[in-house]
């Protein structure tokens, strides 16, 4: 399986510390995992975790051309798929799969797990991501999602509504995008999961969709 880190956002939630020129994922605000007093960026932290999990060599970071040098200055060995313009998540996924197939050594039968660049998570998160390929094959699904059990009725996350429970996976009955607090509490009682923004697709399926839109499958 291959992995995609989406890093193309403008990251202005920490303004004025972060801005268009220096999005939040590149600010050195978090402690390194080695218990030193040094700080690192969210990108550097997640990249170190990917290396520890044995995933970094099969990972591409997808970002705009204006962020390329920032990425290289922080994770020199990273492979980067450069977006010519912002086209939101689906456009970034199309571009990433085209890069993996034409530049990254992937075949159309390989799977790609797409992740945000700035999760503040532990080792178990990455071990779960690794399981997505097997779940996709067992379930026959076109898209695999990763959810988290909510700890409070957040209005900042989307919710995945669970369907039938299978051996190691749950079918998806529906979604609720950033509900109000009352609705979020109701969803929690129904066993809904937070949408982590992590999903898995077969590369060939995405390239086929790209061609149907008149977009070339080569990067």
How does the language model describe each region?
Residues 72, 77-166, 207-212:
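Conserved beta-loop-beta/alpha segment of the NTase-like Rossmann-fold superfamily
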Residues 63, 67-75, 171-180:
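Acidic-glycine-rich active-site phosphate/pyrophosphate-binding loop
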Residues 21-22, 155, 170:
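Short, solvent-exposed loop/turn segments at the edges of secondary structure
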Residues 5-7, 62, 113-116, 146-149, ...:
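Short beta-strand segments
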Residues 150, 159-219:
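Catalytic core of tubulin tyrosine ligase-like
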């Amino acid at each position: 399986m291959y992995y995609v880190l989406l890093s193309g956002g403008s990251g202005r939630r920490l303004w004025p510390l972060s801005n268009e020129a220096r999005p939040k994922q590149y600010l050195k605000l978090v402690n390194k995992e080695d218990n030193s007093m040094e700080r690192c960026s969210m990108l550097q932290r997640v990249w170190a975790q990917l290396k520890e999990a044995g995933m970094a060599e099969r990972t591409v970071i997808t970002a705009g051309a204006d962020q390329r040098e920032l990425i290289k200055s922080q994770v020199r060995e990273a492979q980067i798929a450069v977006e010519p313009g912002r086209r939101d998540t689906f456009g970034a996924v199309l571009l990433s799969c085209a890069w993996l197939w034409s530049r990254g050594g992937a075949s159309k039968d390989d799977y790609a797990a797409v992740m945000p660049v700035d999760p503040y998570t532990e080792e178990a998160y990455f071990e779960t991501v690794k399981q997505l390929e097997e779940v996709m094959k067992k379930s026959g699904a076109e898209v695999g999602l990763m959810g988290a059990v909510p700890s409070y009725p957040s209005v900042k996350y989307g919710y995945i509504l669970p369907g039938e429970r299978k051996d190691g996976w749950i079918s998806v009955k529906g979604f609720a995008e950033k509900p109000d607090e009352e609705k979020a509490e109701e969803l929690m009682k129904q066993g809904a999961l937070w949408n982590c923004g992590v999903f898995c697709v077969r590369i060939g399926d995405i390239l086929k969709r790209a061609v149907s839109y008149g977009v070339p499958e080569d990067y």
